[in-house]
Amino acid sequence: DIYAKWFAWVVEHADGFACISRTVRDELREAVAGRIGQERSERLTYSYFHLGSELDLRENSGGTPGELADVFADPASVFLMVGTLEPRKNHAYVLDVFDKLWREGSESKLCLVGGIGWKCEALVDRIRHHAHAGSKLFWFAKLDDDGLDYAYRHADALLISSHAEGFGLPIVEALQRGLPVMAGDLPVFREVGGDFVAYFDLTDPKSLKALVTSYQRDKADLAPRPPAEWRWIDWKDSANQLVAAATSGTL
């Protein structure tokens, strides 16, 4: 396993680690201790910083593809997923939920944005040959920045269902644009999204189905706090955090 060999080498040679979330820092500290022992692990530094986002908020140049605009052309709710197609992103979980909703007569749409990753042949085949492909299920594998911005600004909610993440940047990108977010109940998502996100149980598809059904009915954000109150650091603050993390190891 390439990653396992790389990580084993890093653990033996690094003096410290700067991670992109507090959650990852804590998980990494535990993993390192498991490999080299608690005493050696405590000699290393562990810090974290958060990614910024405001550079994404720019004026759209008008280059939005017509096919993308068509997805949002009617009143049906559009739920957006952003991320490479790979097992960790857990697209199949969301597809299972929407298959049940569509069988029950839902007119809501699911729009996937992300390129082909790895170990996703079955998922790609499922999407391409889905009964609702092009009518209720849409996939854009090569969307440019303008297109992604358009999708964020016109969707009804972002869904993020990953089994594991280091940060969860789509949460920040969505909330920056006032888009409600529904996310799997992971520690890192709660770290980033806090009370601005509605969480669902990744072991129980019924919990996501209930959120989507409620949103379809009421068109109201289900999180305790609305996106309008969302504030996040900019890239200058992010860079300052990284410098502090790299120089002090105590962030």
Residue spans for each PLM region:
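Carbohydrate transferase catalytic cores enriched for Leloir-type hexosyltransferases
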Residues: D1-L251
